[in-house]
Structure formats: C-alpha cells, structure tokens
Amino acid sequence: YKRQMHEGVANHFSACAPNSSTDFYVNKAGIHFSQIKASDLILVTKKNLEDLKNKPDLIDPTAINIHGTIHKKVPHAKCIFHVHSKYATALSALKDPILKPIDQNTMIFYNRVSVFNEFGGLGFEDESIKMANALGNKQHLLLANHGIITTGETIAEGFNYLYYIEKAAETYLTALSSNK
C-alpha cells in the first residue's frame, strides 16, 4: 500500500500451505492489500477448489487458477504475488519489455524474467497453464500489457522481488525516457 505496488483491490497473493504440495492460501477478493489480515486468507485445497471457483464474491476465480496452476507446476513458487504496479505494468506494455542490466536493481532480474505475450486478460485454466509454462524455471513473469507475477521460496523473498522489480522497472523506464 505505502509502496504503491497495487491497483485497487485487483491483486492476488498466495502462499503454499505448510507440509503440502497442493494446498495454498490466497487473499479474499475485494480487500485492499493494506487491509488484509491473516483471517482474510482462504485455504484452497483439492476438496474445496471447485466450490471456491464458484464464489467470486469470496475469492477471485482467476486467482485460484493462476496461483493454483503455478504452485502445482513450478516447484520453486512457494509464494506468488500478482500486481498491476505502475512501473512493471508500463514495462509490460513496451514492444521490448526486457529489463537491461543498467544498475544494481535491474541486474538482479537480468535473464530471470519471462514475458508472457499471450495474456488475454483472464487467467482461466488454459491460460493459467500457459502462464506456468512461460514462467518455467524463472521467478518472474511479465504479463504483456497487464502487470507482473513474482515468486519466491518464502513470503519475504517473494515480496523482496516484488519491491525490487518495481524499482528496477522505474529506473529502466526513467533511463529510457532520457532518449540517451
């Protein structure tokens, strides 16, 4: 919230449940990141998955699809953030959205970000699979004209990457604006 890495309430956060390779917690729909409490995280399991997909007022079905598929197909993605932050979203809209290593923050992400150019705006099941495949062994996925997904082994690592990719995108776009 204070770092402006959100867009209203259209953001998702998830973390794998301890000792489970399939269950994960995801934030409720309609709650601003600055207002989310532990009690606002919903445990998604194999048993309640389909039921939760039919409760869009409780949980965004695209969040279940995107996060569930990535957690299942990308073992290193224990924590996932999906946001529409200002600079990462602007970067995702460029013809060439690849961050060049021009400073210490952009170097963190050199060759560590995949770009998903097929993003159609809704992460339903087929698209979620394509997104997970595009992420592959990298930790970050730029969604063309949309935003960013960052992953981490822990919540702290995922948030750290989210913070620094936004700073890297800001630095890179500022440098591009100089036309030098």
Model-derived features with residue positions:
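Glycine-rich flexible loops
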Residues: 2-180
